[in-house]
């Protein structure tokens, strides 16, 4: 495969139900580690970046629930004291329809790079090049909530 380069980077955010005891003024590391976490565990998911970083820091989370899919998280979190770390775009979507609160994680997590890939054999194909350029242009005008900043995550 050839890589066209990074399109953008997602930041991670924490999500919790509105009124979650640790989410009112932002979560401390102690509250974060003590809280029960809902985690998505599936190979190749962006969650591996957050999980690996937290593990490398020597931090141990209280895993209350594991799921192979993000789609169940908002429903599980909305009616519980579970928290989760998700890419910002998912946090925005979940906050909008499930009434969840977003906040910056209390630990520094690297951004999630998103790049487009295509078969090297297609590099000379005009249709492929057109599509690659179109996708790149669309991401230049992307939704600003996909940016890596976390200062407005609350």
Give residue spans per PLM region.
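Periplasmic-binding protein-like
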Residues: 10, 107-118
């Amino acid at each position: 495969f050839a890589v066209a380069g990074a399109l953008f980077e997602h930041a991670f955010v924490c999500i919790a139900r509105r009124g979650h005891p640790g989410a009112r003024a932002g979560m401390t590391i102690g509250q974060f580690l003590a809280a029960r976490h809902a985690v998505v565990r599936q190979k190749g998911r962006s969650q591996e970046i957050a999980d690996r970083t937290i593990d490398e820091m020597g931090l141990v989370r209280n895993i209350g629930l594991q799921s192979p899919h993000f789609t169940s998280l908002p429903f599980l979190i909305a009616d519980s004291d579970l928290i989760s770390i998700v890419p910002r775009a998912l946090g925005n979507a979940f906050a909008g329809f499930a009434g969840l609160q977003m906040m910056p994680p209390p630990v520094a997590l690297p951004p999630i790079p998103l790049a487009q890939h295509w078969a090297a054999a297609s590099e000379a194909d005009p249709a492929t090049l057109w599509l690659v350029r179109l996708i790149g242009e669309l991401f230049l005008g992307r939704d600003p909530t996909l940016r890596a900043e976390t200062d407005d995550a609350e």
